[in-house]
């Protein structure tokens, strides 16, 4: 399983600390990759553009959370080859996460957390 940490220039320090927490829990450093906002031409081209979110018009900003949409590019980033854990840069490992892959099977290729019955995307496990 690869761990993909999404980030932008404002979140580099946090993402390095997150990576270190996964390494400390036994994930090899070569299994930790960064999804970089600054390297994504498509997302960068959308800065300043309008989009619809929850029924309201918003402007896409290059801000603290500009990396958010990178999470949906994780499977393509690893060429659809394996299971991946996609996390925000402020998510840290308190134990080795390898056992969570058991949430995925032939019927479930995506797992995430829920808050108040709503799916969250800060931590997503994907069978790419």
Residues covered by each model-derived region:
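Glycosyltransferase catalytic domains, chiefly GT-A lineage
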Residues: 1-128
